[in-house]
Amino acid sequence: MSEVTLLVRDKEVVIPGQPLARGKVKPGKDVYVDESGTIRSKKLGLVSLKDDEISIVPLVGAYIPKEDDLVIGIVSKISGNTILVDIRSPYQGALPIQRRAERVDLKKYDLKIGDVILAKVRSFDGASSLILTIDAEGLGKLEGGYLLEVDPAKVPRVIGKRQSMLSMLKEATRSEIIVANNGRIWVKPPSVKELIVLEKALKKIEEESHVSGLSDRISSLLSQELSR
């Protein structure tokens, strides 16, 4: 048998049927070998290369970053001039500390582990290099509030056409709400009652996003729950 020929990189996102490798490599989970001896992916997922084995980690419901995406992250580590951020993705975000950049509010980078931030994806190479930025106005540390989550694929339904659903949630619960592309939602309601109602509304949106008349059902839920 021939030597190994890798056609993908470790942690690269692949689609079903995509060729992964040929030669002396062991097929692992969620891959198959075609008639020509090429190992291919069975699912949408991340390539995992370990020793002489290649497998796929499925990405059902996972957030795959795109340039200019708005994300809500949690500071997980501070190493030298880089702040590492969990963005609810197989990829960890890196926030370079701009110590000498002009027109940058350096106080924004005064962060600690556990802080919640609103950031934008500045660049992503599709494999391992995911760079975030908080330099623009409105980005940076989120003070107080609560973090809720939905499937990233449901984010457009939470926002609605021309932000109609998001506006309804804000107005009905009198809450500050920020919805990010990675499915994290930061809310700052006036009381725990509104928080609970928002959780119920988001769950309903997530479960019934495929059914018509969703806005009317959410409006009814908000009215009923908030009038109690």
UniProtKB/Swiss-Prot annotation:
PANTHER family: EXOSOME COMPLEX COMPONENT RRP4, PNAS-3 RELATED. Residues 68-135 form the S1 motif domain. The keyword Nuclease does not apply. GO terms for cellular component: cytoplasm; exosome (RNase complex). Component of the archaeal exosome complex. Forms a trimer of Rrp4 and/or Csl4 subunits. The trimer associates with a hexameric ring-like arrangement composed of 3 Rrp41-Rrp42 heterodimers. This is Exosome complex component Rrp4. Non-catalytic component of the exosome, which is a complex involved in RNA degradation. Increases the RNA binding and the efficiency of RNA degradation. Confers strong poly(A) specificity to the exosome. Its main location: cytoplasm. Keywords: Cytoplasm, Exosome, RNA-binding. Disulfide bonds: none annotated. It comes from Korarchaeum cryptofilum (strain OPF8). It is found in: Cytoplasm. It comes from the Archaea. GO terms for biological process: CUT catabolic process; exonucleolytic trimming to generate mature 3'-end of 5.8S rRNA from tricistronic rRNA transcript (SSU-rRNA, 5.8S rRNA, LSU-rRNA); poly(A)-dependent snoRNA 3'-end processing; RNA catabolic process; U4 snRNA 3'-end processing. InterPro entries: Exosome_RNA_bind1/RRP40/RRP4 (IPR026699), KH_dom_type_1 (IPR004088), KH_dom_type_1_sf (IPR036612), NA-bd_OB-fold (IPR012340), Rrp4 (IPR023474), S1_domain (IPR003029).
